[in-house]
């Protein structure tokens, strides 16, 4: 099982896409071998190029830290992969399932502008309907029931792996977000309870603590701050 890194949510999004890049390498390697065994030269060559592409993306995110560029290219490559193979093998080959899987992953995009993930989601949806309306019959001789069943099973497994991975990382991301909020809340409470100049409890904190005390078993002692005059003269 994948273990979430102990970092903030942005680091976790980067972690998600590093794993997704590795998944892309494995997936396209399987397709390249399968297409080679079935003697389909064009899709075999395409998937070999895709393996090299994902290796390049892995280097881009690990060495150059260009996560936004890598994520954009990965989503565009997915659309290109699905479109090419749907045109070659027909709609019934079910390559469109990858569009469904990737559309659910766009909300882990490392972009500063919040609308960009929705743009990629719309591109996946648009590609889905355009392929459905315009592509039915395959270009390659792939209309045999056995071959279509093999492609359907492989594509279904690949798409469900992506969807299950999204479900897992969504849960882990929610945990990270919750931990970050708790830490932020603790920091804010600490800032609210202490005077920023003296480092001592401020009036509101003292009033809150006094209200929590049992009046019959509590004592209040008041003292002066030795360097209060220095603080007052320095900061006003």
Where are the regions that the model predicts?
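Hydrophobic transmembrane alpha-helices
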Residues: 24-35, 54, 60-61, 72-97, ...
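Juxtamembrane or sensor-core-proximal signal-transducing alpha helices
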Residues: 157-185
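Conserved nucleotide-binding and Mg2+-coordinating catalytic segments in signaling enzymes
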Residues: 186-208, 223-236
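Alpha-helix C-terminal capping segments
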Residues: 206-216
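Cell-envelope/extracellular polymer assembly enzymes that use nucleotide-activated donors
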Residues: 219
